[in-house]
C-alpha cells in the first residue's frame, strides 16, 4: 500500500458568495430581478484589499446564482457595491489588491455644476439604482469541501414623487412651479455611512401635467414631478 504525502492531498475548498436583497417593501429577495452588476471586495485584518471580483449580466438572474471567489482560508471584511457600470450615476475609485486600503473604497454620486456665481452642484437626471452590502468579519474555513456565505444588500436610491393638485379643479400650470430638494448626501464611505460632501440640489428628471384622475395623462388639474 502507498501512503500519499501531505503535499499530494487535495485540500482545496470552494468558496461562494450569495447576495441577498430582501430589505424592501415586499420583504422578498429581489436581487435576481433588479441587480445587473455586482462587485465584491475582500479586505484582510489590516484593512488591505486582497481580492475583488465583478460579475454582471444574465448570470446574476439565474436561479441559485452565487459568485465563486478565490480566497485563502481566513477572516475577511467583505464590502459590496452593486449597480455600478459605465452608465451608472455613481462611481468608486480604481483599487488594487495588495495596495489599496478599506478607507479608499468610497462611492461618489455624479453631479453637474451650474454656471451661477456659487457654482451650485446639481443633480437633474434619474439616478441609476445603487446597492451596498457589508459583512465586517466573515470566516472562510476548511471545515467542508464548499462554503457559501451571504452578503445582504440595501438599496441606497429612491424615487420621490410630488403631486400638486388644486382642490377646486382649476388647472395647475406645470411651468409655474419648480420643486427642488437639497442635501449633502452624495458621498458614501465603505460602510455606507455618509461622508462630508458639498450640498447637492436635486431637480425633477420628469414632469407631467395630468388630469384629476391620476391614472390618465391628459391635460388637467394636477402636476406630477419625480425626483431621485
PLM segments and residue spans:
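Bacterial Sec-dependent N-terminal signal peptides
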Residues: 1-21
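Short, low-hydrophobicity acidic/polar segments
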Residues: 49-155
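Tryptophan-paired
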Residues: 38-93, 172-228
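Residue-level recognition of well-ordered beta-strand positions that form the cores
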Residues: 18-22, 41, 81, 163-165, ...
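Structural motif
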Residues: 21-33, 163-172
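Short, solvent-exposed beta-strand/turn "edge" segments of beta-rich domains on protein surfaces
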Residues: 6-9, 29, 150-155
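N-terminal low-complexity, intrinsically disordered tails enriched in Ser/Pro/Gly
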Residues: 2-7, 26-32, 54
